[in-house]
């Protein structure tokens, strides 16, 4: 039987009012708390008027559980009463609705009518540190700003529809070294989204001192709501405050905030990146939101494998925001070009430049294309382009953070770095406060059955139908009511339904206005971004009980086990229609389409929200519509991305696909890696495209052509070279060599550091050293031990040599380059017959294989090893022992979701029906 719960669904209107904050006050961009006066300050940016600061107050509060056993005030009721009187404490019993986890959780609310400091002191005087180890699950006190927003039901950015309406200032420094102790700032660029632009130059330390002071004066004059840089947390702010110290500037005096008695703080903080956490130093200036824009890109990169780098140059190109005349300067040349002020020819159409001494009269030969300028001017143009791109990247990637901050009762700085489970935690804490509810006892984290990820056909497949369920896990929760019992009012279900309905509405509006009003369409598209984050993070929060008090591993496992059953149901249905399943991953399956699929017809009956009654569906869409009508109820629905020309499945979670527009997507370390040598990346880009086009013969010819280039040392050094970043000073590196590993061995040598020592380089942290292996055997590593000493099988490349001639060729280790190359090609051979697999790869092009057209045909279903490909029955369709064990514990039939299907559905699965 299907589980039944009797909570009434909370209306979307109630949820919307709660999320947006019931208090109507608009234009709050920041909240500050003054500990000395126990006062809240609201910083507002009023359109047309500028900044305004208003004082307010609130009653601070704490959720507490059973403090017995903690010797609170030595268990003396008299002492507790005296302390309550002293600190203005009132205690309220919270509602639990008889729920066991709520009864065992934080069941009291403690408030201080005297202030936040007094609330904290009440606990400390009683011997309980609110943030101590023994009280961490007994006392919950939020920061004052979050308490204020929750208790007053206010939200940031109310009244602003778009991120661009808020005044944003970005800045960037140009320095002549990587560390403040080794150099100075010679240029500061400042730009806002409201048209302000300024470059402050400084030729010496005296001018540098003035430039830093002027930088803070500009901030004070403009009073932006948001201050951002790109990698500013690790670089720019560190430089500014270190140079202040070195130059003898009192940073607290020149950094003017919006409060005369407060300046800035710098504290260790954490950036949450999907399943990882990264440390950084948060700079905070009173009254402002200070962010590092790279954090938003890094967070996007953690969940989007298509983003290969978080570098500004790359990410601007990725979002198609690069200006055609963008000027680029290698970071190692910026200081030199600025200092020497040599003359250059600048191509104003594409941003490229050449030394004036090497070319004559380019402005006359190409009027309107070239102008003569100087190195320092190029640096200024480069800086301005950097700032413009920083604003564009901020607009693109922080739009979601801005909209999240308008719903989550916390600071913008925190929203920009917090994990998704914490988003739900903040919402549920606010809901519990509003409805006088206890906070549930936390559950422990346990192992449970995850999603179904299988590979059924390795190799090459054509006419690939890509199907995935629309928001599978959230839809399962809504349709089958899979929510924790401790959410006694049904808030999580109400919010999830609101988010889902609202996102669909925004997506439909974005599509509706796409042709007639691009700006309005983009606005609706942006509005659905944060909602997508909420929807997709619900399952993660539910499965993270150590963070999210309402987490429930039992419910999380029901979601994944039900998801597996829906995946099996979908596979059975489409196999009955002649499709062949290729690969599946949690919420979707790729199928190879049958012959004659274009003749499939189905008239929709409107039994699912994705199917229009009376509409005739053709081809694969007919089968998707029929499946939706028969099996999908409520929010559940199957989506199609259409039929894609081809795909190559190399291994589990390693594949290449070509979409209907010819765009190729690569997934997995077999064919995509940040550490891939450029010459191999270049080959794979073209080679994989040939294979996806089904042209095995051309791929084989291209392999031998490219192998010949590698063999004859005709590959440019820029593509063969390794790029290593300096992460240790030379002094620290030398110290490292004197230490031993845990096994008692000497520490390994680093080729780039050995080259720096050998060439007497004065390297800085962050410098990139390019070098080429020139050994004579494949086994020759970059550095080899020989007796007590070492042998360097590599040489260094000067970056300016490659700038002058990017196609420069030279000496490199051919056997090693070929071995590395062939290792990357081998996984691709899964698309070929055995004859090609056995005879294609050689280490000398003279020994190439010859293959017939028939032998070059691409295939699928033939793995290298037996375990490389899953079996349909045993590995996919059969329910695992772990799943059966869960369903037995739960008291549910594993096929309970079929209860919602249309009557007589059994015949629609043919031989694959489950009962």
Residue spans of the language-model regions?
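DnaQ-like (DEDDh/DEDDy) 3′-5′ exonuclease domain used for proofreading
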Residues: 4-223, 249, 372, 385-408, ...
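Short amphipathic alpha-helix segments
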Residues: 73-84, 560-577
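Active-site-proximal helix-loop-helix substrate-binding element of RNase H-like nuclease domains
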Residues: 200-202, 206, 223, 227, ...
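Short glycine-rich phosphate-binding loop at a beta-alpha junction
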Residues: 225-232, 579-585, 590-592
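Short active-site loop/helix that positions an aromatic residue
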Residues: 235-246, 470-484
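Cytochrome P450 catalytic domain signature, combining two hallmark sequence patches
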Residues: 248-255, 481-490, 604
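C-terminal, non-catalytic extensions of nucleic-acid polymerases
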Residues: 597-915
């Amino acid at each position: 039987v299907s589980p039944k719960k009797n909570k009434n669904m909370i209306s979307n209107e109630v949820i919307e009012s709660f999320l947006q904050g019931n208090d109507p006050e608009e234009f709050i961009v920041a909240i500050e708390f003054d500990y000395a006066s126990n006062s809240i300050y609201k910083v507002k940016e009023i359109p047309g008027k500028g900044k305004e600061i208003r004082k307010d107050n609130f009653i601070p509060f704490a959720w507490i559980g059973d403090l017995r056993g903690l010797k609170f005030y030595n268990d003396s009721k008299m002492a507790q009463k005296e302390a309550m009187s002293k600190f203005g404490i009132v205690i309220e019993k919270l509602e639990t609705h008889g729920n066991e986890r709520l009864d065992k959780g934080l069941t009291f609310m403690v408030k201080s009518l005297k202030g936040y400091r007094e609330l904290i002191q009440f606990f400390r005087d009683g011997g309980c540190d609110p943030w101590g180890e023994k009280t961490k699950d007994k006392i919950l006190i939020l920061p004052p700003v979050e308490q204020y927003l929750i208790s007053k039901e206010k939200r940031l950015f109310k009244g602003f529809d778009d991120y661009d309406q808020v005044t944003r200032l970005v800045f960037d420094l140009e320095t002549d070294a990587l560390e403040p102790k080794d150099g100075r700032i010679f240029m500061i660029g400042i730009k806002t989204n409201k048209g302000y632009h300024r470059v402050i130059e400084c030729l010496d330390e005296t001018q540098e001192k003035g430039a830093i002071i002027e930088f803070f004066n500009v901030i004070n004059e403009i009073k932006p709501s948001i201050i951002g840089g790109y990698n500013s947390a690790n670089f720019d702010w560190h430089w500014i405050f270190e140079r202040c110290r070195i130059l003898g500037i009192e940073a607290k005096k020149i950094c003017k905030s919006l409060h005369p008695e407060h300046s800035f703080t710098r504290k260790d903080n954490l950036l949450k990146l999907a399943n990882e956490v990264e440390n950084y130093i948060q700079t905070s200036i009173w009254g402002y939101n200070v962010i590092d824009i790279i954090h938003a890109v890094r967070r996007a990169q953690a969940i989007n494998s298509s983003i290969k780098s978080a570098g500004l140059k790359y990410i601007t190109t990725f979002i198609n925001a690069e200006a055609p005349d963008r000027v680029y300067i290698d970071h190692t040349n910026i200081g030199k070009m600025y200092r020497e002020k040599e003359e250059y020819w600048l191509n104003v159409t594409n941003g490229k430049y050449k030394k004036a001494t090497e070319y004559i009269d380019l402005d006359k030969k190409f009027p309107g294309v070239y102008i003569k300028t100087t190195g320092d001017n190029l640096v200024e143009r480069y800086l301005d382009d950097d700032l413009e791109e920083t604003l564009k990247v901020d607009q693109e990637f922080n739009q979601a953070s801005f909209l999240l901050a308008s719903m989550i009762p916390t600071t913008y700085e925190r929203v920009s770095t917090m994990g998704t489970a914490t988003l739900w935690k903040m919402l549920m804490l606010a809901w519990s406060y509003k409805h006088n509810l206890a906070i549930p006892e936390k559950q422990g984290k346990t192992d449970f059955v995850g999603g179904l990820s299988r590979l059924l056909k390795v190799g090459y497949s054509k006419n690939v139908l890509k199907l995935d369920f629309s928001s599978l896990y959230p839809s399962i929760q809504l349709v089958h009511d899979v929510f924790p019992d401790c959410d006694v009012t049904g808030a999580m279900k109400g919010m999830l339904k609101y988010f889902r309905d609202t996102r669909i509405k925004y997506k439909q509006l974005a599509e509706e206005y796409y042709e007639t009003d691009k700006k309005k369409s983009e606005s609706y598209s942006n509005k659905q971004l944060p909602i997508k984050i909420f929807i997709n993070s619900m399952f993660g929060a539910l499965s993270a009980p150590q963070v999210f008090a309402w987490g429930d591993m039992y419910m999380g496992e029901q979601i994944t086990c039900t998801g597996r059953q829906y995946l099996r149901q979908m596979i059975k249905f489409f196999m009955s229609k002649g499709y062949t399943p290729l690969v599946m991953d949690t919420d979707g399956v790729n199928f190879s389409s049958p012959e004659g699929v274009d003749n499939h017809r189905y008239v929709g009956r409107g039994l699912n929200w994705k199917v229009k009654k009376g509409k005739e569906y053709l081809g694969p869409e007919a089968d998707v519509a029929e499946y939706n009508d028969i099996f999908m109820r409520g929010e559940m629905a199957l989506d199609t991305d259409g039929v894609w020309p081809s795909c190559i499945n190399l291994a589990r979670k390693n594949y290449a696909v070509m979409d209907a527009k010819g765009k190729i997507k690569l997934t997995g370390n077999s064919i995509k890696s940040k550490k891939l040598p450029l010459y191999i990346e270049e080959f794979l880009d073209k080679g994989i495209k040939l294979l996806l086009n089904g042209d095995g013969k051309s791929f084989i010819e291209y392999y031998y052509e490219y192998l010949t280039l590698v063999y004859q040392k005709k590959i440019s050094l820029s593509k063969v070279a390794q790029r290593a970043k300096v992460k240790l000073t030379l002094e620290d590196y030398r110290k490292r060599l004197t230490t031993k590993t845990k096994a008692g061995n000497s520490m390994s040598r680093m080729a780039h550091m050995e080259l720096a020592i050998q060439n007497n380089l004065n390297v800085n942290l962050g410098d990139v050293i390019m070098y080429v292996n020139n050994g004579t055997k494949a086994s020759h590593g970059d550095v080899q031990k020989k007796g007590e000493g070492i042998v360097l099988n590599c040489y260094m490349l000067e970056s300016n040599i490659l700038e002058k001639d990017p196609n420069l060729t030279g000496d490199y280790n051919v056997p090693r380059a070929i071995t590395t190359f062939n290792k990357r090609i081998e996984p691709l051979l899964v698309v070929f017959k055995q004859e090609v697999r056995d005879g294609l790869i050689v280490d000398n092009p003279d020994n190439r294989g010859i293959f017939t057209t028939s032998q070059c045909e691409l295939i699928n279903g033939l793995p290298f090893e037996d375990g490389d490909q899953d079996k349909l029955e045993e590995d996919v369709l059969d329910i695992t022992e772990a799943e059966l064990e869960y369903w037995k514990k739960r008291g549910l039939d594993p096929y309970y979701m079929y209860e919602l299907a249309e009557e007589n559905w059994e015949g629609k699965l043919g031989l694959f029906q489950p009962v």
